[in-house]
Amino acid sequence: MSVEKRNFGFIAGKGDVEIYKITNDNGAFVELMTLGAGVHSINVPDRNGNLGDVVLGFDDVNDYVNPDLGYQGLAVGRYANRIRDAKFSIDGVEYNTPKNQGTWTLHGGGRFSFNIWNVKEVGDNFVTFSFFSPDMQDGFPGNFTMTVKYTFSNENVLKIEYTVLSDKKTVANPTNHTYFNLSADSSKTIEDEYLQINADKFTETDDSQLPTGELGSVKDTMMDFTSLHKIGDKIDDPFRAIIDGIGYDNNYCLYDKKIGELTEAAILYDEATGRNMEVWTDLVGIQVYCGGWLAKDGNAGKGNSKVTYRRGVALETQFYPDSVNLSLIHI
């Protein structure tokens, strides 16, 4: 195992971004950015041993800080996903967060994702990043430090560990926003990739994709991924929790899950290459997002690739969206 560092580029007003490359003994490697403690690439073999990059991203570091391009690969904090009306209360005190998506907050306002993180520790097979947010920054209480540790193994396991510390009672919902395309060919949509989600319920949403406080059953609906099947089989079916033309952007409630219990949440499989990915988590939910909000004409990605509509699927482990405001949802 080895770790190498290189300069990735410069972002005005933020500084230089570095990439840390962790290579295992079999030649597979991951590249991690100081920008947003993000994943720049994951290069793993297909069934014939050929390496391919299975995540979307950019050659130009400045593209990563454009929120319209989907938070590619970036860590998200303080609070991932949605907060209705950009506010929540703790012990009777109301806190107001940025309205960066209409009338509500998305991904805590984006600060954690679009800033350069410190490198706290580097080992033979891991890198740990940290970011500090002062009390009341973006409306969140507490002097708050978040660390993200990435460890890569010879078995091609990428482990992500989040630690959050605050000197006041606060909220936290960290996740990672990497988009996967196991074909390693971004000209192919993720509609032909196979997905299984170990969940029989999802959080119901309104027309703005904000949780209503109800949980829906996946049974006999397009939301059912309890067995492995193609993402594209029903992605365009009309359904109350889906916005026409967007496809999946929904939180699934993992089977009878308790926080801290590590279980398998999802399986992603590409038939053409034989690549198979398991997602394990100790959190209670997973957001499945197929890039339906990305521009259909796309943006230049890495090499000759494109970052565009339905070219990658994000599998974001998390607490349920807007759980700070919904008492029925266990957190």
Regions found by a protein language model. Name each.
Residues 186-271, 276:
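Active-site/ligand-binding surface loops and adjacent short beta/alpha elements
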Residues 6-58, 84-95:
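Beta-strand-rich N-terminal accessory domains
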Residues 52-112, 211, 223:
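Active-site loop/turn microenvironments that scaffold catalytic and metal-binding pockets
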Residues 21-34, 132-187:
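Acidic, contiguous internal or C-terminal segments within carbohydrate-active enzymes
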Residues 107-112, 117, 244, 250, ...:
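Acidic/His-leaning functional-site neighborhoods
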Residues 27-28, 93, 200, 275, ...:
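Well-ordered beta-strand scaffold positions
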Residues 329-331:
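Conserved small/polar residues in nucleotide/adenosyl-binding loops
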Residues 1-16, 21-25, 94, 98-155:
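Extended, loop-rich substrate-binding clefts of extracytoplasmic carbohydrate-active enzymes
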